[in-house]
Structure formats: C-alpha cells, structure tokens
Amino acid sequence: KNSTNNNTRLTNENNLESTITNNNVTKNISSNSTINNDDNPVLEQKYSVETGTVFKINTKEKKLFNEQGDEEMVDLSSSFNPQKVEFMKAGGSYAIVFGKKLQSFACETLDIELKSAYAPSKEVYHPGQGLTAVEKIFNANALGVKKGSILHSGSDVRVKVNIVGSQDTTGLMTSQELEAMAATVISPTVDGAYQSGCHTASVWDFKAQENTPKLMKFMHKFGLITARDPKEAYHSMTDVIHKVLNDITVDDWSIIIGGDSHTRMSKGVAFGADSGTVALALATGEATMPIPESVKVTFKGKMSSHMDFRDVVHATQAQMLKQFGDNVFQGKIIEVHLGTLLADQAFTFTDWTAEMKAKASICISEDDTLIKSLEIAKSRIQIMIDKGMENDDKMLHRLIQIAEKRISEIKSGEKPALIPDNNAKYSAEVVVDLDLIDEPMIADPDVNNIDVSKRYTHDTIRPISYYNAEKKVDLGFVGSCMVHKGDVKIVAQMLRNLEKTSGKVSFKAPLVVAAPTYNIVDELKQEGDWSILQKYSGFEFDDNSPKQSARLDYENILYLERPGCNLCMGNQEKAAKGDTVLATSTRLFQGRVVEDSSEKKGESLLASTPVVVLSAILGRTPTIDEYKTAVEGIDLTKFAPPIEKAQNTSSAHF
C-alpha cells in the first residue's frame, strides 16, 4: 500500500511533504498556553516528525497513519489527484509524460481530435471572471486542452516551457535523470537553456574539479549553453544562474523552470523544481502543474531618499503580516506591480518571494520599462555570443530574435506588456504604504524565540532602531542573486563618502563582496568603481589561481570574491561558527551560512547593501543617524509606484 518509487513526483503545491507538515501545527489558545516572543501562543505539533519517525501511507484510503496503522495522522486526498495516481500506477512519471507528448504530437500532425487514454487535465473555468497575469501565461502556453478553453486557478494542465535552468549542485542528478529516460538532445521547443557553475564557484576543490567538467560536457552535448566550455574555448563563467536566466528570458509571457527555489524571474513566471522535473522540461519542453491562485501587491506613497529598495521588499512582508495576521503569500503567485523598475532591480523583489513562501511571482511592468529591460537582455546575450558561448544550434541568436520580435510587438501596440484583467480574481490584495518605511529593515532569524516554529523563518522583520546600535556584527556579506550592479556601486560610493569624511576606511568586521556576474565586474572596471574596491581590499579573486580550499578564518578586511553564490550557498565556505552575519543574501536557516558553536548560536541577519557595509565598518548595527550620514548623496533606488492605467478587460490576445 506504500508508494516509494523515486520517479513518482508529487511536486505540486499539495505534495505529500507539505501536506504532512503544514497540517501538523495547532495553536493552543487556552489560558495556560505558552506565549512566544510576539505575545502569541506557541504553535504545537500534533504528531512528531523527528528524524526516524515511521509513517504508513495508505494509498487506498489516501491517508497517513502511524507505524502501527491504527491511528490516522492526516488526510492526503489532495495529493492523490488522477494525474498523480496515474504516475503511481505506471511506476513513475516518465512513461506517462512521454506518452502524452507523443499522442498530442501525432494528433496535431494528423489534424485529428485528441482522444487521450490518459487522465484528462483538470480544467477550471468561471464564466465572467477575468484572468490574472499568471492565468494569462498558462492559457497562452497550455497543451492538450480544447481550443478556445479558458483556464482559471485550480486547473492542472500541461504547459510549454520556454526557458530551463540547471545549476551545478543538482545538475548531476538532472543529467542522471536524462540518461535514465534515454534522452540525448534538448527539446526543439525550448527557447533557451543554461547550465550554471555558480554554486561551486567559491572553491575549485577536488570535488568541483571532478564533477563540474563532467557535468558541463554532458549538458553542452545535450544542447544547453554552459558556464564552462568542455574544450575551454572560452573563459569559465561562474555567474549566478538566476541572473543569467533573468537575462535570457526575453518574453514576459514565458514559463521558466529551474533547479533552484530562487528561479523567480522578473519577466514571465518561473518555478523552482526538482532535478527530475528539470530533466523532463529539457527533454520534452513541457511541465505539468496546477495554476496557483494569485495575490496582488501594489504600492502607495513615496519612498524616503535614504531608503533602499531592499527595505521595500522586507516591508512588504512585514506589512502583509500586520494586515492579515497569517501569511497570505504562502503557496500563491505574488503578482507585484513594479512597473517603473528595470528587470535587474525588480528581480530583487521577485527573488525574495521564495522567502515569502510564495509558489512563484510575476512582475507587472510598463511598456517602456519592459522594452528597456529587453534591450539590456539583448546586449548581455550578445556579450555571451562574443565570448564564444553560443552552441551549434544558435540558441543565443534565436533568443535575440525573440527579444526583437517582442519589442516590436510592444512598440506597435500589437501586444503590450502583460497586465491582468481588471476583473481578475485574487485570493488577497496587499497594498504596501511606502510612507511607513522610514528606516532600514532587517530580517532576523530570531534564534532564541521561545516558539521553535518562529525561529529561522523570514517573517521576523525589524527596523534597525530595534537593535539600539548594540548588535555586534562579526561578518558582512554583499552578494548572492539578491544584488545587482547598483548594489556593488553603492559599496564603492560608500567607501568614497567615508574616505572623504574620515580620510581612510577601516573595517571592524570582515566584509565579503561577491558580484553576481562577470559582466558587473567588467562594467565596474570601465566605470571606475572597481578601483576603489581594489584599494581597500585585502583579497581579490584570481581566475588564474582559484582557491583550492575553503577559507576558515577571516580578517577584518574587504574580500573581493569570485562571481557566484559564495557564502549564500554555504556548501563550500561559511562564516566562523557562532558568528553573527549580516548579509544581503536570501537564506537565514540554521547552519546554512553559519553554524552554531558550543558557546553561541550562529545567526544570519539579512539587510540592504548600505546597512551591511556600514555594519562591517562599525562592527555593529548602526544608528539611524549614522546610516543617513553614510548614504547621503547616494541614489539608492529610483522606485516609485506605477501610475494606474485603465486596463483592457479582454483576454482574447493571449
């Protein structure tokens, strides 16, 4: 009665793992309940999920039982939809996925109606209801549904995948999956695909030397653009995968699949996935998934000049929790209206939606802004071509053609930038008041909260004044997919400011800076910003002599590390055990960036670039006045709420 086949993939929002864990908490509101740090009752487990606990899944009753089978834990019926049961019966998903694709192709070729023997797609339609942005994208990319069908959230369908990303720590598993399904070449329907080398960029150790070239050779032969050339025809690139995927996504109607939870592009809609789903997307150009509900996020008010856009991102989470009490983003699509920001800056928001526990996110952009973003994408793809990264199939050239076509459609008015219908239905609507954001915001792991469930989440957002300039900072880190070129320029500008006022700059804590891409480093060198970073650095990466082992000890200096994930990933290098780290990165989980010591818990707090830089210089969190002085004259962000326009309710153009 227990299904344990590794190829049975229950990766939709109702998968077994989330069903088991999300239904396992209860709030004791009795008078004798324990109160946590936020004056709320501590959440309690209904049953243990400690390592070693044994459960039995009864697939006939669709329920989870204890080891003895005499006590029901939770109902799992939502995980046993017809499509998933079909996978179980087949002993895995591959035969079903390929069978559906072959059958659809045959019917299209013969121009006959599809009468499938497989479980039909679940189609949900509400007459008179408009479409959210993600519903429009799914409708445009849906496969195996009747022509003219309109799909709303709750539908579960096959969709065309436009862009696929594989990263270097899960890529080996993806290659094994491709070999297992006897796939030898990428699907011709995939517009673009990239294999990164960013997660193992920090240290070129024995493991990386053994695995990375083998992975790159396989993926290059399969048809992906690869960060390293198997024949070393071009300089090895360790650019952060999400930045590259954001650049090669050249259509705001795209669906993107990537082997990482931060696959959350600011053009199109992107989903992080397991290695098997990535392999299927590469081999078939398809994925099967439900259309999630959407939460609409808009902004009002005006940003203070001393605030960074990262503070808007954190404030969104804080204001949402204050407005609703519970996290309304969880498992949903966040449809964020950031029309005035270019794709690079907008990605700072869409990327963080992983920490908001959203299923994915979609950025609503204005026509002129989207055109500028696509022009930037074109130029960066051309740089990849100039470096020799193009493959035999001319994938990068085709991406430029797609971008040019999309720009032409927007300019002519034939197909403007994607927007939702004004009568679309949302599960919730969040309005972020920019006037309420007057000081930097920090995401705190709250490692000593009496409620264990409240530790190491991203929901504890605190203003900098909370720390009274007394929070010791042992290491600062500016890097990860959350930052862009503007962030590294801010580091340089702050050093110049402090040099003018103090004569020199010294650090009371180590500051590690890792630009996410080589393009950024090259542009900073041309613009004169890299030289000020070099002036104060005690270490600068050297591609001719990469580090062979992880750094164990840090001095109070500026480190200019190789582009890539660096400390954010935590798989190669970490801060010293027990350190308090202040970083621009994404994760604050226990043991990720810093492990506990025998004397003190390690903690990774997350903040904006200027807060991290200043804290490393001071060795502590700054006062609000110290912060304002340090960023004076620096243009931290150009974000302003987009002006609402009358929307066309017609969805015919998808």
Spans of features found by a protein language model:
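Fe-S-dependent hydro-lyases/dehydratases of central metabolism
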Residues: K1-F654
